[in-house]
Every structure is written in structure tokens, then in C-alpha cells.
């Protein structure tokens, strides 16, 4: 890999990296794994307080495995996508049973854990164990598509990394494993803070002079792709639109103001009135109760009976709620305390 990319990227990260607890020198592999699961589809600001509470209560896999799965759901609070809490609890029990209570360093062993895909396995192996792997989250994929391929990345968070993306990422990894791991988190941070989807700040980018996308004039994704905007007069995608800076090689300089122009806007998903909101309300009732709850407790927080039934059935099917023989409902593993 060219030092023209590695050196400025790593120097920028050393100056600008956010102070996050899972990046601290003493962070354990378990801490890194928990953070990666929590950060799936959830921003850092929401994760941070819940992560700190979780790690205070369950600093090791054994501590979590010793409690019922329902307690993991209760502690998960309002982070969303609560099946992640179930997967973390299941992972903890597997770590205790098969790995001596420790997170394995082997990539295949990590992939075999519940809810751990290629990205999360590579992230844990890299960030917790200093290994050399391509870590391809949304931010990294966007940065590398722009920087090395000169392309506006039009993928979405739910799209899987392609073979071409993986090969590109692997070709850019520094040879030394520890440096490669730091490179991976540096690229991720650059995508989160500077090379953002909708408002990239090219003037603050440490590798702007090497950026093929900037040199090409920041081309937009094709119409109809994820990130392309349908607004009349818009010139770019989510990820396009910040002005180039004078003196940056190849920049399409005067396209915007000094602070950058926001061109594409992400569509916000409707939440009010959805099944997801209903599920959240029902889980909130259970999380706030010390005993199992009656059906009437659910009726009190959601008026639409058909939707309530559908949401409750889904929670039961997902293993997030246990229906009890007496007609009440509880978080999984909870013991009825009273009638």
C-alpha cells in the first residue's frame, strides 16, 4: 500500500479520533464485541450510555450468561432491534460453554457466533486482536469507493459488500497487522466524521489530494440508486455535494460554499403507527414490570387490536416474549413471582 495514503490517514486519526470506551487501550475483546453489536444500525450517541451501563453490569461473557435472556432485553432499553440483545446473551452462553468464557480470536470461530457476520467478525478480529482483515462497514465502503475507485458509492447499509469491494479493501491494507487494524478504524472514522454520505467535507480530508472521486468532480450515483436524490435541481447523491477546496488536486472546486453543500437527503423511515413502534411499546411494558403482565397491560398502551395481536405474535415468534400458561406474558427466562 502506498504511504501517500497510510501516513496521512493514520496521522489524521491520531489527531481526530473520538474518545470512545471500546477503543481504549484496556478495552477487552468482549467490550469490542458488545460495542460492534450495539452499533449495528444505531448511532454512537445512542449506543454510548447503554454500552456503559451494559459493561458495568456484565463486564464479562460469564456475567451475562449467568442471568436470564430476559434481563438482556430489559437492559437493552430503547436501543432498537432487541433481537441483538438475545443474540448477545446466546453468544455469552456459547463463549462460556465452548471458549472458556473468552472471545475467540479466530475469524471462523467469530463468524460461528450468533448474529456475527463477516463485517462484525472482521471488526472484532481487527480491533480486539490487532489482526489484518478488511473491515467493510458502510463508512469504509463509501470512503474507499470515492478515494480509490473514483465512484460515488450508491449502496445501502443493508447491502452486502461485493467481491470487488473486498478485493479493493484488502489491496489497501498495510502489511503489518497492527497497522492494518489501525488503518481500518481510521478509514471508518474518516467516513463517520468527514467523508460523510450527504455532506462530505473534502477540505478537511487528509487524503483529498489522492481522491479519485474528488479529481473526477464528485460524480453522483445514477438516478434510482440508493443515495441518488430525486429532487429537482439536485446535482448529487447522499455523499456528494461538498465543495472542493482550492489547492486540492483535481477538485471540482467552486461547486459549493466553504462549508459544503448538502445535496442529497436520506429518506427518513416512518415510525409512528408502525408494527415496530407497537412492538417497542409492548416490550417497554415488560421491561418496566417486575412481574409477568396481563394482556390488559398491553391494551392500555396500544389501541389497534389487530396490530397489537400481530406485534405480540411476532415478539413471541422472535423469542423476545414468553407466553405463560396462566395467560400472562414475561420476558424470556423470567419466573412468575405472583398471581
Model region roles, listed by residue range:
Residues 316-329:
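A short, conserved structural fragment
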Residues 335-339:
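Short, amphipathic alpha-helical interaction segments positioned at domain boundaries
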Amino acid at each position: 500500500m502506498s504511504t501517500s495514503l497510510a501516513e496521512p490517514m493514520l496521522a489524521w486519526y491520531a489527531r481526530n479520533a473520538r474518545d470512545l470506551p471500546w477503543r481504549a487501550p484496556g478495552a477487552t475483546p468482549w467490550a469490542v464485541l458488545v460495542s460492534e453489536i450495539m452499533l449495528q444500525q444505531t448511532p454512537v450517541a445512542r449506543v454510548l450510555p447503554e454500552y456503559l451501563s451494559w459493561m458495568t453490569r456484565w463486564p464479562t461473557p460469564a456475567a451475562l450468561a449467568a442471568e436470564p435472556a430476559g434481563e438482556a432485553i430489559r437492559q437493552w432499553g430503547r436501543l432498537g432491534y432487541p433481537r441483538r440483545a438475545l443474540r448477545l446473551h446466546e453468544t455469552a452462553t456459547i463463549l462460556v460453554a465452548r471458549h472458556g468464557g473468552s472471545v475467540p480470536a479466530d475469524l471462523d470461530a467469530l463468524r460461528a457466533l450468533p448474529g456475527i457476520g463477516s463485517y462484525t467478525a472482521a471488526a472484532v478480529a481487527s480491533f480486539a486482536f490487532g489482526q489484518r482483515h478488511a473491515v467493510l462497514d458502510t463508512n469504509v465502503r463509501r470512503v474507499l469507493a470515492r478515494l480509490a475507485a473514483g465512484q460515488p458509492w450508491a449502496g445501502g447499509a443493508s447491502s452486502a459488500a461485493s467481491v470487488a469491494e473486498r478485493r479493493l479493501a484488502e489491496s489497501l491494507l498495510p502489511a503489518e497487522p497492527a497497522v492494518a487494524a489501525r488503518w481500518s478504524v481510521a478509514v471508518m472514522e474518516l467516513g463517520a466524521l468527514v467523508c460523510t454520505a450527504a455532506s462530505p467535507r473534502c477540505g478537511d480530508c487528509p487524503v483529498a489530494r489522492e481522491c479519485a472521486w474528488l479529481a473526477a468532480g464528485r460524480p453522483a450515483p445514477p438516478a434510482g440508486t440508493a443515495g441518488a436524490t430525486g429532487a429537482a435541481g439536485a446535482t448529487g447523491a447522499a455523499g456528494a455535494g461538498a465543495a472542493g477546496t482550492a489547492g486540492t488536486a483535481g477538485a471540482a472546486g467552486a461547486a459549493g460554499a466553504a462549508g459544503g453543500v448538502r445535496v442529497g437527503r436520506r429518506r427518513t423511515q416512518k415510525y409512528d403507527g408502525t408494527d415496530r413502534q407497537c412492538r417497542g411499546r409492548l416490550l417497554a411494558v415488560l421491561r418496566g414490570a417486575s412481574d409477568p403482565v396481563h394482556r390488559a397491560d398491553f391494551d392500555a398502551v396500544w389501541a389497534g387490536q389487530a396490530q397489537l395481536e400481530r406485534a405480540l405474535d411476532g415478539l413471541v415468534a422472535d423469542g423476545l416474549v414468553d407466553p405463560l400458561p396462566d395467560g400472562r406474558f414475561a420476558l424470556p427466562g423470567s419466573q412468575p413471582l405472583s398471581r
